[in-house]
UniProtKB/Swiss-Prot annotation:
GO terms for biological process: translation. PANTHER family: 50S RIBOSOMAL PROTEIN L9. Belongs to the bacterial ribosomal protein bL9 family. This is Large ribosomal subunit protein bL9. Keywords: Ribonucleoprotein, Ribosomal protein, RNA-binding, rRNA-binding. GO terms for cellular component: ribonucleoprotein complex; ribosome. It comes from the Bacteria. NCBIfam families: L9. SUPFAM superfamilies: L9 N-domain-like (SSF55658), Ribosomal protein L9 C-domain (SSF55653). It holds the Pfam family Ribosomal_L9_C. Binds to the 23S rRNA. One of its GO terms (molecular function) is structural constituent of ribosome. The lineage of its organism: Bacteria, Bacillati, Actinomycetota, Actinomycetes, Streptosporangiales.
Length: 148
């Protein structure tokens, strides 16, 4: 099944990409959730015009992403989470928690969908999370999780 992505899908592509997927994946997951639309010649023409406009914006956004990366590189992020006596958290640290902590630490506003936490953070300590600002700009952000 040939589809045009309308949202970024990990492991598949970014908005505007034309992808070939299995029928069930497209019909049962991508189309109902609005992550993709069916490919037609008319839709392809629209996508081509959108890509040209995006290419012009892409150059500007790369510069912006590099500036944000510099700001994040000098940031000390500290998360206060409820924890038991043994240092184990009640729950875990989410990308929303990290985004709010970055903003509270005086950093730029970061979209929670851009933050990738490789392994669940369930105890106090020092961790590193990856922030994907741009396809060419990734930032490793050290965070300190402190029990309250």
């Amino acid at each position: 099944m040939k589809l045009i992505l309308t949202h970024e899908v990990d492991g598949l592509g970014s908005p505007g990409d034309v992808v070939e997927v299995k029928d069930g994946y497209g019909r049962n997951y991508l189309l109902p959730r609005g992550f993709a639309i069916k490919w037609t010649r008319g839709a392809q023409k629209q996508i081509d015009s959108i890509r040209r406009a995006r290419a012009a914006r892409e150059i500007r956004s790369l510069d912006e992403a590099k500036q944000i990366a510099e700001q994040l590189g000098s940031l000390k992020v500290r998360l206060n989470q409820r924890a038991g006596d043994n240092g184990r958290l009640f729950g875990s640290v989410t990308s929303t928690d990290v985004a709010e902590a970055v903003k509270a630490a005086g950093g730029p506003e970061v979209d929670k969908r851009r933050i990738q936490i490789r392994n669940p953070i369930k105890s106090v300590g020092d961790y590193t999370v990856e922030i994907r600002l741009h396809p060419e700009v990734n930032v490793s952000l050290p965070i300190e999780v402190v029990g309250v």
